Amino acid sequence: MTDINFGHIHIKLADLMKKQGISISKLAFRSETQRTQLKAYIRNDIQRVDLAVLARLCYALECSLDDLVEYIPPQDTHHS
């Protein structure tokens, strides 16, 4: 496999929680998601995104997926 930088995905959960003034405990309750899993999403420490979790977070935070997830393009924009 080639060593290509495709950029990365940033989960903006911490920003949304701060903006809405919601605690991790309240979000865990509203989204029916474990606190440990939420902490991983807050730290952007996930390798495989669970679409069901994203749907529950969007529902609980009353936001769109676009509000929650952002694609960060690579710094080097030269494609081969």
Locate predicted features.
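Short, charged recognition helix plus adjacent turn
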Residues: T2, G7, A40, V69-S80
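The alpha-helix within a helix-turn-helix
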Residues: M17, A28, C58
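Residue-level detection of the helix-turn-helix DNA-binding "recognition helix"
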Residues: K18, R43, P73
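Phosphate-coordinating loops and pocket residues in cytosolic domains that bind phosphorylated ligands
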Residues: F29, R43, E70
